[in-house]
Amino acid sequence: MSINNKQWLGLPLNLLWGYIAIAVFMTGDGFELAFLSHYIKALGFSPAEASFAFTLYGLAAALSAWISGVVAEIITPLKTMMIGFVLWCVFHVLFLVFGLGHANYALILPFYGIRGLAYPLFLYSFIVAIIHNVRSDSSSSALGWFWAVYSVGIGVFGSYIPSFTIPHIGEMGTLWLALLFCATGGIIALVSMRHTETPRHMQNLTTREKFAELGRAATLLYTNRSILFSSIVRIINTLSLFGFAVIMPMMFVDELGFTTSEWLQVWAAFFFTTIFSNVFWGIVAEKMGWMKVIRWFGCIGMALSSLAFYYLPQHFGHNFAMALVPAIALGIFVAAFVPMAAVFPALEPNHKGAAISVYNLSAGLSNFLAPAIAVVLLPYFSTIGVVIAYTALYILAFFLCPLIRVEQPGFTSDQHAKPFTANAAES
């Protein structure tokens, strides 16, 4: 298949509307992220019960993310995205009507949990389309744009819009509005990606061979040591993102006196920053080296900014301006992990779909483990215990990075050597 090289600052123009679809869909999916845990608590459930709902959701998302890369290669990214789209809409309605609508915890868990299967199928399948439609030496910047539009959706619009709608139509009205955004994003993807090409060799495999390829998404973890270490680093990458969304509303709103709208605007500032930092680090990593950016700016930056996200608000109290400082810092450094999405397929060039599935599984496990750590530590060590745990794990990732041996397109096997010619790097 041919690769379209038309780009704008690393954005592949042939996939432009796919990027827009991701932004719109994830806007709807992101509405709940920064207020749902507090809303579930307001319905009469404990903080641990609210966190457990997110933990179950994260587990479902991890399982779905694990298979999404291989499934997207076998049945095409578009079909996989459509399965995720329909699943999201159906179980979101069930979650609102029978779960939250009746404050029924026994129904909140299964409907919200099953809905967790949906967004990874829609979101991560698009990574397969990117990997197969851009040159490998340009994949870091293309994936930077992917995470940028993800941030536009789930973080910026997903946080700012609820901060204005909740005072007028309430939490439930805002959650119903989310359905409109997700439906629009799904329709945009359906229309715009009908002719997006992906290699067809996986689609012609026998059923047995397809299951074998699906299994490879797990076996790579012990057959390729660099994949294993990369997976651990990717899991650690977004612990603060998913964990702070669960624990920080309780600290900011219940303890420090912020309104829900103020907290949502602080959280949106974090995501707004990542729009630019995702693109920035994607481009920088192609010049400086993937692992160098991940290790020194991602791991160290996130360790420090995670601590700041707790200590600065605790010191200054209900001070909106000072609360923005650690939020912006967190947004700058979490994006330094963007090259991880390019590292995985580079480690397994003959099984890119399986490698991407491991990457997606790792992202999903991060979604699962972040609130799980909170569930375990909150009753004993409060918010600070959770923050310190996340910080320690970022330091662990710093020491794991040198163990990942990846040959970056555009570089010789020595990552510190000068880039060789672009022609030699093309896939």
Residue ranges and their predicted role:
Residues 86-102, 300-316:
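C-terminal ends and interior cores of transmembrane alpha-helices
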Residues 74-85, 287-300:
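Cytoplasmic membrane-interface "Motif A"-like loop-to-helix N-cap segments
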